[in-house]
Amino acid sequence: MSDYKTTLNLPETGFPMRGDLAKREPDMLKRWYEQDLYGIIRNAKKGKKTFILHDGPPYANGSIHIGHSVNKILKDIIVKSKGLSGYDSPYVPGWDCHGLPIELKVEQLIGKPGEKVSAAEFRAECRKYAAEQVAGQKADFIRLGVLGDWDRPYLTMDFKTEANIIRALGRIIENGHLHKGAKPVHWCADCGSALAEAEVEYYDKTSPSIDVAFNASDVAAVLAKFGVSSVDGPVSLVIWTTTPWTLPANRAISLNAEFDYQLVQIDGQALILAADLVESVMKRAGVTQWTVLGDCKGADLELLRFKHPFLSFDVPAILGDHVTLDAGTGAVHTAGGHGPDDYVISQKYNLEIANPVGPNGCYLSGTYPELDGKFVFKANDLIVEILREKGMLLHVEKLQHSYPCCWRHKSPIIFRATPQWFVSMDQKGLRKQSLSEIKGVQWIPDWGQARIEAMVANRPDWCISRQRTWGVPMSLFVHKETEELHPRTAELIEAVAKRVEADGIQAWWDLDPADVLGADADNYVKVPDTLDVWFDSGSTHASVVDVRPEFGGHAADMYLEGSDQHRGWFMSSLMISTAIKGKAPYRQVLTHGFTVDGQGRKMSKSIGNTVSPQDVMNKLGADILRLWIGSTDYSGEIAVSDEILKRSADAYRRIRNTARFLLANLNGFDPQKDSVKPEDMVVLDRWAVGCAKAAQEEILEAYESYDFHRVVQRLMQFCSIEMGSFYLDIIKDRQYTAKSDSVARRSCQTALYHISEALVRWMAPIMSFTADEIWSYLPGKRAQYVFTEEWYDGLFGLDASETMNDAFWADILKVRSEVNKVIEQARNDKRIGGSLEASVTLYADANLAGKLNQLRQELHFALLTSKALVERYENAPDSAQATELTGLKIALSEAEGHKCPRCWHYETDIGSNADHPEVCGRCATNVGGNGEERKFV
């Protein structure tokens, strides 16, 4: 008996079945780096239209977490997909290197500046520490498969970048947006510094909730407003507050001009309250009986004066729209030094902006005997007792409410009026211009627009000064007496920037003012403040994008960060760009959600539900992490767990196995010599290429709209449905048994080749390592890397006007599905083993029969049976099985003949060929003759 196995075209490839990614990926990375893959891509894309995704800099502190992985991989997917779309898309990663977290780490190592080390030594250690953190994070980002200019990233502590940050401040000053003022700012006593909006988080806190009486200074004048001549006891305007510690700074009581206020008599005292709140105040104060003596509008009480409850001065009643009826008494205790609304209304009435609290959060000497030197939050109970002793406390209770806290220390913060530098939102129309610019940006998801519009519309002036050591200096000179900026500020800023560009920020602190001011040095002093780190990162469109040569002077096309950055980097970048350029720094802003565990819980070390990207890469490989991110709808919360990653690994195996099948069956195929022209190909092969074409159209549209989970879904559908459950199954017979160089086989290989060329490109942005590996096994001459290529343009499909068009094959697929059900039932009943043991008779109506008959003798190949007959529907015997397809019944029987040892089909002509007596006639033709002809399947 002959060994016919050697006559088969069995699949063969060196492409491994197992990905073994954790082991294989580092070797690939080494090759990418040694061959300068990023540089190769840049050279290949030179001269193309640019797409610039500007990297929002992560903070240079600590190891990367799973959220970092999401962010960087999403960016990498976009950059790579844009490259495949024909763009030159350089990616320059960056890091945020100044600021408090690094200072705190360095303090733990060497102590505070000015104690064990000088400020200069402290800054040098901060720079060294930040560089170490950058190196660690960089290694992890590279391990993720993210391609970028890792040898030349931007760091906000680069001397040139520090200088350009200073220059950005100079342009803001030139355009009239900077001012100085003693405004209340978020202040952290633990930090000893002002905080930016983005550095504030909210947590629940329990505070005293108190109603406090302010007695009228001129009782008769107050009573006259209510049309009352006398009352029993003192007349008091009642305020409600949850911050008793701010009462020493009280300088007014705010009322709403439009509200109705009532004079209410209780036992031994007359109270002034908003009419709509009288009942709720009485209820919480435990007062069951009261009498309304009179009423008036809030406007009637303007500028009447009331005695401070424990300090020896009186304060005016003033009017403000910020007073509401949501809670309280309708009268708001007003301390301009401790609240933005209070500050605005105090400015309007030209009131003192009192700030009796020092930078450490303790009262200054001279505030009040029992309070001097006390920490404000510890003083709350003291103040309640003082009010009780003075008879000014109407009611006290504990209230749990959301309270602003320091993002770093998690401790409650205060509003505190300090001399600070601000970017004004309104003095030169920055708010109005920013709101206008927002409308010209594409926000993805689109709810991002309303979110940032609300933030810009309601935000206060931006306090950009900080009292820190490790930061970019404001580099300003102010007059010793007037505190006005030097008239040559623009020129001086450039002079300082040049020194910083040469020697770093220490150059500012080492600078002798006389070196740049000359004789003016006697009258001007250096501003000691540093810039808010959000100014550092928010100015990178100017300090980095505008100056890096690879960006060619183009503005950024996209900013992509987590959804918390609407009030962070997106906001600060918008403010600075609009202030210095009059336009937004980006065309598109894309946000992603935060990672949660499989149960939807926030990641927390204390819960123990964190997922380490390093662990995932070491165990499963970066491509599994990348596929998980690519397959997730990142617009909301992004769930990750061992089980979810396992599902990603399963999906990966399906895709890898498909790719391996394609490669194995391209063995011996040279696309230059062996390709079959589309018009000469077997119809089914053209259909398969058409499936790839249809899939590519959807995949490219999904990449274009950044819906990467749709890319993965369509890729999986293509591999599992069109290919895995139909086409790849059907072609095995023709691929393995036809003559190796026959049109029948080469047609199939031509289809597999086109499909492979497309598939590897679809995968490349998401499963980059695997795509590169597949690329290296594909036949034919090609570029060194798939990442330098564009989407495959060699796909074609069936014309809708053809008889065997896509709709025709869709019907064949439905018939095959019904046949499979009948075969499966027969196997379960032990009537047959495999499908090739079956012969099926399809009883079809005229319409369906007409389609099935077009496949002629090749129909059984499409059904994976040894025989297939088509009969009239009405001739179906009772034993024929009904199907879910209207007009189709199926009868199954055992195939006649014997099993051919070569093709495994059951045939009645085995032995008919004398030269090859062991095999069927078809195989004999394929082995020793001209080979079978296939037209359809």
From Swiss-Prot:
Protein name: Isoleucine--tRNA ligase
Subunit (UniProt): Monomer.
InterPro entries assigned to the protein according to its UniProt record, in alphabetical order: aa-tRNA-synth_I_CS, aa-tRNA-synth_Ia, Anticodon_Ile_BEm, Ile-tRNA-ligase, Ile-tRNA-ligase_type1, Ile-tRNA_ligase, M/V/L/I-tRNA-synth_anticd-bd, Rossmann-like_a/b/a_fold
Cofactor note: Binds 1 zinc ion per subunit.
NCBIfam families: ileS
Cofactor(s) of this protein: Zn(2+)
Subcellular location: Cytoplasm
Organism: Pectobacterium carotovorum subsp. carotovorum (strain PC1)
Entry annotated with the keyword tRNA processing: no
Catalysis: reaction(s): tRNA(Ile) + L-isoleucine + ATP = L-isoleucyl-tRNA(Ile) + AMP + diphosphate
Family (UniProt): Belongs to the class-I aminoacyl-tRNA synthetase family. IleS type 1 subfamily.
Pfam assignment, any one: tRNA-synt_1
Main subcellular location of this protein, as a coarse class: cytoplasm
Motif 'KMSKS' region boundaries: 602-606
GO cellular-component term (any): cytosol
Alphabetical GO biological process terms: isoleucyl-tRNA aminoacylation
UniProt motif ('HIGH' region) ranges: 58-68
Gene that encodes it: ileS
Residues bound to L-isoleucyl-5'-AMP: 561
Coiled coil regions, renumbered to chain: none
A single GO molecular function term of this UniProt record: tRNA binding
PROSITE patterns recorded: AA_TRNA_LIGASE_I
Native organism taxonomy: Bacteria, Pseudomonadati, Pseudomonadota, Gammaproteobacteria, Enterobacterales
Function text: Catalyzes the attachment of isoleucine to tRNA(Ile). As IleRS can inadvertently accommodate and process structurally similar amino acids such as valine, to avoid such errors it has two additional distinct tRNA(Ile)-dependent editing activities. One activity is designated as 'pretransfer' editing and involves the hydrolysis of activated Val-AMP. The other activity is designated 'posttransfer' editing and involves deacylation of mischarged Val-tRNA(Ile).
Keywords: Aminoacyl-tRNA synthetase, ATP-binding, Cytoplasm, Ligase, Metal-binding, Nucleotide-binding, Protein biosynthesis, Zinc
